[in-house]
Amino acid sequence: MSQVILDLQLACEETSGLPDEALFQRWVDAVIPPFQEESELTIRLVDVAESHELNLTYRGKDKPTNVLSFPFEAPPGIEMPLLGDLIICRQVVEQEASEQGKPLEAHWAHMVVHGSLHLLGYDHIEDDEAEEMEGLETEIMLALGYEDPYISEKIAE
């Protein structure tokens, strides 16, 4: 049986109204086990200032972002279940959900799914990579009972 050990860190000033730990666990359990038997990851929920600082330091982008993924790379020959860390900015997620007319819980789920796929090595820099990753995100979100997170983009095409 596959198992995902989740370390949820609440590093944002306002913690009321956040999804509970059971939801975060459900979301990572929907993504990771098909790819990796045993896994450990940290999800850190932060405010704008920390997201902005990390995004500037590690991506060179001078603004906060919704989710940052920091994969863990074990030294050669050492097997470790540690996947890495997700840093999710509460205010950015809430603002995006509002602007995009998406249910807040669904957008939180999408950020966890999206970030977890990055930890597993997926990316969306090239078009073919983006198509594969977005397809997986959609499949997982539908399996979780949420709408396709890219439906508005598909309708616009």
Curated annotation (Swiss-Prot):
What EC designation does it have?
A: 3.1.-.-
Q: Where does this polypeptide localize?
A: Cytoplasm
What this protein is called in its record is Endoribonuclease YbeY
Keyword Cytoplasm listed? The answer is yes
Please tell me the species this chain comes from: Klebsiella pneumoniae subsp. pneumoniae (strain ATCC 700721 / MGH 78578)
- Please verify whether the record's keywords include Zinc: yes
> What does this gene product do?
Single strand-specific metallo-endoribonuclease involved in late-stage 70S ribosome quality control and in maturation of the 3' terminus of the 16S rRNA.
An example GO BP is: rRNA processing
Q: Name one GO cellular component term.
A: cytoplasm
